[in-house]
Amino acid sequence: RFTFTLFGRNMTVALGPKGSNLVFNGRLSQVSAEDAYTSLTTPVFGKGVVYDVPNAVLMEQKRFVKSGLSVENFRVYVTQITDEVKDFVQHDAAFAPLQKGAKSVTVDIFDVFSEITILTASRTLQGKEVRENLDKSFAKLYHDLDAGFTPINFVLPNLPLPNNFRRDRAQRMMSDFYMGIIKKRREGKTDGTGHDMISALMEQSYKGGRDINDREIAHMMIALLMAGQHTSSATGSWAMLRLASRPEIIEELYEEQVRV
């Protein structure tokens, strides 16, 4: 383990099993995720959530999200995810050979899973209004937000750079988009499915008795959208590549899922 100074901040590099244990299992007195990540994530997610709040508040917000990750909801999501994947394969240009009768097709699996992750997440966790508005303009906002995750923003998050201007504009527009959904639901103009994360968050209160406000919900929804995209895409891609290397177990795994 060693420490060096970068742009006036001390940076500690922790290597090996002991280093991993310090990073992932360290006490709050030893490590602070908020101090490490807030300059990178707060401009993207928005204020008042995740690493822009004390750890105790973050733990409560994690509890709010966990309430929406119920077994009941997951059972509902299975059919929705299946429908999205089938529709994607039947209509996306990447699978044109299959649509024309070919028995196989070659695709960039990571690109495909990146798209599928957005489609399935918006259909399930994000809610029907998000899925219905998932067009090119929404994709552009997502791209501009995602571009805000650049290394320089760890230490200098507000440099007058074009990608930061686009990030800030996209954050405001995305936040207002979610606020509009929440407002219509509270006014009874639209109904959620009851199984998405917006529905779950709208019912939550902090331990002190304060209800979570609509802006916090909007920013938590942005965090959910952004935070899970890369890991889910990478994990899905890895799983598919492993299956491709072991074709003899594909049918066995499929039958297992059918039984479940």
Predicted regions and their residues:
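Short hydrophobic alpha-helical segments that form membrane-spanning helices or hydrophobic packing faces
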Residues: T5, V23-F24, S232-L241
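A compact, surface-exposed functional segment
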Residues: L241-V260
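Cytochrome P450 heme-thiolate monooxygenase catalytic core
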Residues: A33-S39, R75-G236, E252-E255
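N-terminal membrane-proximal hinge/A-helix region immediately C-terminal to the signal-anchor transmembrane segment
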Residues: R1-K47, Y51-E60, T79-D87, A170-M173
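A glycine-/small-polar-enriched, mobile loop at the entrance of the PLP active site in fold-type I
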Residues: V49, V71, R75
